Amino acid sequence: MDKLKKVLSGQDTEDRSGLSEVVEASSLSWGTRIKGFIACFALGILCSVLGTLLLWVPRKGLGLFAVFYTLGNIMSIGSTVFLMGPLKQLKRMFEPTRLIATILVLLCFALTLCSAFLWNKGLALIFCILQSLALTWYSLSYIPYARDAVKKCFAVCLA
């Protein structure tokens, strides 16, 4: 369990500088981090489910769905900040191996919200689907060799 804590919180090495001790002293306890992660992730799922239920509201449903679905996904990704910390999360998001996936996810978030508020509401539904695909690809980047396995599966299916 301690190894899991160290990996998730970004304390892989035992390098203890003065700055790391200050950050550690002012940070949340492991139990509080887990509770924050669970609460934020649960709120994210609740927003996504609520958005799905609002999809069937006449006239305004599609826009509400896009907004709540996007907010739910943002909260779900944001929940991992509790586990790793904000700086470690940002560093990992923009590592070269997942840079394109991160940009696609953020672009889909922005395009979904723009289409829900400014453009055609039907376009928001398409961007929500693209958002799900981009989030899946982004999530797979955290699992070693998962994206390679998915690529090979699609290559076999399409061949």
From Swiss-Prot:
Modified residues (Phosphoserine): 9
Transmembrane segments: 37-57, 64-84, 99-119, 123-143
One CC-aspect GO term: membrane
Segments on the Lumenal face: 58-63, 120-122
Pfam families reported for this sequence: Got1
Residues bearing the modification N-acetylmethionine: 1
Coiled-coil region: none
Residues exposed to the Cytoplasmic side: 1-36, 85-98, 144-159
Topology of this chain in the membrane: Multi-pass membrane protein
Source superkingdom: Eukaryota
BP terms from Gene Ontology: protein transport; vesicle-mediated transport
Main location: membrane
Keyword tags: Acetylation, Membrane, Phosphoprotein, Protein transport, Transmembrane, Transmembrane helix, Transport
Subcellular location: Membrane
Alphabetized InterPro entries for the sequence: Vesicle_transpt_Got1/SFT2, Vesicle_transpt_SFT2
Family: Belongs to the SFT2 family.
Function: May be involved in fusion of retrograde transport vesicles derived from an endocytic compartment with the Golgi complex.
PANTHER family for the chain: VESICLE TRANSPORT PROTEIN SFT2B, VESICLE TRANSPORT PROTEIN-RELATED
The name this protein goes by in its record: Vesicle transport protein SFT2B
Organism of provenance: Mus musculus (Mouse)
